[in-house]
Amino acid sequence: MAEDEPDAKSPKTGGRAPPGGAEAGEPTTLLQRLRGTISKAVQNKVEGILQDVQKFSDNDKLYLYLQLPSGPTTGDKSSEPSTLSNEEYMYAYRWIRNHLEEHTDTCLPKQSVYDAYRKYCESLACCRPLSTANFGKIIREIFPDIKARRLGGRGQSKYCYSGIRRKTLVSMPPLPGLDLKGSESPEMGPEVTPAPRDELVEAACALTCDWAERILKRSFSSIVEVARFLLQQHLISARSAHAHVLKAMGLAEEDEHAPRERSSKPKNGLENPEGGAHKKPERLAQPPKDLEARTGAGPLARGERKKSVVESSAPGANNLQVNALVARLPLLLPRAPRSLIPPIPVSPPILAPRLSSGALKVATLPLSSRAGAPPAAVPIINMILPTVPALPGPGPGPGRAPPGGLTQPRGTENREVGIGGDQGPHDKGVKRTAEVPVSEASGQAPPAKAAKQDIEDTASDAKRKRGRPRKKSGGSGERNSTPLKSAAAMESAQSSRLPWETWGSGGEGNSAGGAERPGPMGEAEKGAVLAQGQGDGTVSKGGRGPGSQHTKEAEDKIPLVPSKVSVIKGSRSQKEAFPLAKGEVDTAPQGNKDLKEHVLQSSLSQEHKDPKATPP
């Protein structure tokens, strides 16, 4: 029987020999893993034993094989918790140290402690939880004084750990990375993994700064400077939470960078244009951010105010284009208090009247300053002035302002005015006749010659005929009104749009009190042409009826002037009519005499300018 056993087991030995040689000659991956878990001394012993076994015969090898111990050895139990070579053991060890502590008067249920550990492993999703037996072994190694107790009633009893409790303040353990399996030592994993992330962030910041320097033409040392520059230049919104955090946390860092910016400022030659801004930094009118971004305020002002604009203005000095732009801009002076600002001398306001759209024209009229003096050519500027309130006159009634702006008192003593004060302004260059009757030139017919005008009017009505006017001598006492009618027919279109103002005396009983005359508007010297068309249809404001009769008297008033229609350009301005309205008026005889002389001179001097009006 004893011999049969070796024979029966001899195939095993024969079958085992080739794998043994294969293990020695061709190590497999299993051998490599086992060598990694065995110490060097054990490996040396195994190699010595193998050398001795190779000298054995087959029977000796079989005997050695049968004598080898079977089952797990006791050395495995001691090596598993102590060595902590497995990742699961390491996570369990860390969790117990971070969440549990010794306390003699406290008991914790075993199942609740294990459930908390299992949830922790599930949250990591990178390790498997240990079994309850292995977890209990690790707890006993960490806390050797704990005892296992069974607490609770019959059927509801639970096993508890007596002598430990949960920590009230749990510190957050360093979480491992996702690539811990590649590292040989699991403890170094959480410390090594942040390094690649930091390098990645630094590389990204460097690339962003390089891109910002090329785009913005400025130099930036960090990504923080880029963000501050974007905020100060209003390129992004400054109302976000990140913008407020950046402004609040960057004040201390800006003060440290101030000396470096002071040394870089003089190289760009910006101290001269900024000299005015350094003198009074505390009285700057604009906010510091906007002012320094535009003018590049100096480092002295930054050091005093300690605002968050240090880094933005310093890179701006490196750009030549920005420097040229700043040099062209006007210097921004500080705002002084209102009490210290000297009052600016202001000239008294000039009340210029609102002028109408009429063109300004200059004409030369022969005028006589005194009765009997030769007429002199005086240039007159025609302007249209606004309505002026009535000026108090020496007459009994208040003055009324005609549309042209002149104020003419209605008193009896001021009714007769000379030729210089009755010619209205020339409104838009309309031609007018030079033969002006006395009733229109002086404003009203003189009371002394009302009877004479009635006699001449009766005689002229009897001799009025149609056709061309006949040439008469200058000394005849009669005149034909036919030229006046033809002139009125030619200028009827223009006379229809000329404003007229008629006024008469308020309550006087003489024959001239109710006379109707046109106001001194532009074309007041149209003469009998416009007076004839306006006299019949216009009702006097004073309510007098004889206005049309005096208009007809004015048509036949001038016997010494030949019947010609001659025109002149321009008219008297209202500037010369104002003194006449205030009281500087001539007497009636002097006004009639000046009128006759003026009409004669103007007719003779302007005769060659109107060939159409010359009779054949």
Swiss-Prot record:
Q: Name one Pfam family in it.
A: RFX5_N
**Which SUPFAM superfamilies does the entry link to?**
Winged helix' DNA-binding domain
Biased segments, Basic residues type:
463-473
In this entry, the residue ranges of the DNA-binding region are: 92-168
Resulting phenotype, D145H: In MHC2D3; uncertain significance
The record's Gene Ontology cellular component field reads: chromatin; intracellular membrane-bounded organelle; nucleoplasm; nucleus; RNA polymerase II transcription regulator complex
Q: What subunit structure does UniProt give?
A: Homodimer. The RFX heterotetrameric complex consists of 2 molecules of RFX5 and one each of RFXAP and RFX-B/RFXANK; with each subunit representing a separate complementation group. Interacts (via PxLPxI/L motif) with RFXANK (via ankyrin repeats); the interaction is direct. RFX forms cooperative DNA binding complexes with X2BP and CBF/NF-Y. RFX associates with CIITA to form an active transcriptional complex.
Q: Which disease is it linked to?
A: MHC class II deficiency 3: An autosomal recessive disorder characterized by immunodeficiency and recurrent bacterial, viral, fungal and parasitic infections from birth, usually affecting the respiratory and gastrointestinal tract. Most patients die in infancy or early childhood. MHC class II deficiency 5: An autosomal recessive disorder characterized by a defect in constitutive and inducible surface expression of MHC class II molecules on B cells, monocytes, and activated T cells. Affected individuals may present in infancy with infections and hypogammaglobulinemia, but the disease course is mostly benign and patients do not develop severe infections. Some individuals may be asymptomatic.
Q: What is this protein called?
A: DNA-binding protein RFX5
Supply the source organism for this entry. Homo sapiens
Q: Which gene encodes it?
A: RFX5
